[in-house]
């Protein structure tokens, strides 16, 4: 989990069907601050004697690179969202960054020459205090030189999908529901 804002964690409770289908707790990887907030917002998922139908989560606090499914190394990327530090993630040669407004130079080193760069882009113009806008993203793309970039966490202020796609560089695309990326 990148951070504790509602649009990033409130849906955890809706994952109950997956938890019940798998008959085991759902692992959640996050930093200590986010773990504390998840326990605060979903206390019923962590009590010893849960009521029938309550979800069950296992919190794994991230402190450096960790491994998913015993095969995928995940490197956390420290990013800034307005005035709070949140996480992005790098999986092999793909990075996922959402809700970023700044990336420190030391963290940019982890993001250079990726196969796939997934980054938030709220709108085309009018700077925002907590999210990148298109000119900032395109500047990052030039600096980091990923082979492909997908824009996420976009608003209606960016424009219509087909129109925006024609305005973007060849290696930058809008993400969309159902998009599958191989890396």
Question: What is each PLM-predicted segment?
Answer:
Residues 104-183:
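Binuclear metal-ion centers of metallo-dependent hydrolases, dominated by the metallo-beta-lactamase
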Residues 1-97, 106, 163-183:
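Binuclear metal-dependent hydrolase catalytic cores
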Residues 101:
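Beta-strand/loop nucleic-acid-binding surfaces
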Residues 2, 97-98, 119, 152:
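Active-site flanking residues adjacent to catalytic metal/cofactor-binding acidic residues
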């Amino acid at each position: 989990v990148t951070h504790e804002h509602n649009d990033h964690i409130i849906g955890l409770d809706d994952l109950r069907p997956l938890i019940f289908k798998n008959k085991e707790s759902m692992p959640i990887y996050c930093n200590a601050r986010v773990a504390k907030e998840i326990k605060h917002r979903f206390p019923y998922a962590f009590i010893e004697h849960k009521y029938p139908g309550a979800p069950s989560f296992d919190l794994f606090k991230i402190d450096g690179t960790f491994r998913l499914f015993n095969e995928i190394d995940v490197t956390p990327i420290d990013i800034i969202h307005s005035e709070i530090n949140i996480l992005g993630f790098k999986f092999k040669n793909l990075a996922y960054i959402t809700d970023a407004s700044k990336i420190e130079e030391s963290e940019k080193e982890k993001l250079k020459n990726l196969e796939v760069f997934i980054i938030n882009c709220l709108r085309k113009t009018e700077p925002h205090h907590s999210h990148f806008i298109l000119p900032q993203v395109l500047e990052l793309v030039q600096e980091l030189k990923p082979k492909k970039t997908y824009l996420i966490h976009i608003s209606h202020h960016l424009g219509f999908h087909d129109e925006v796609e024609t305005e973007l560089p060849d290696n930058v695309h809008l993400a969309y529901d159902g998009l599958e990326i191989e890396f």
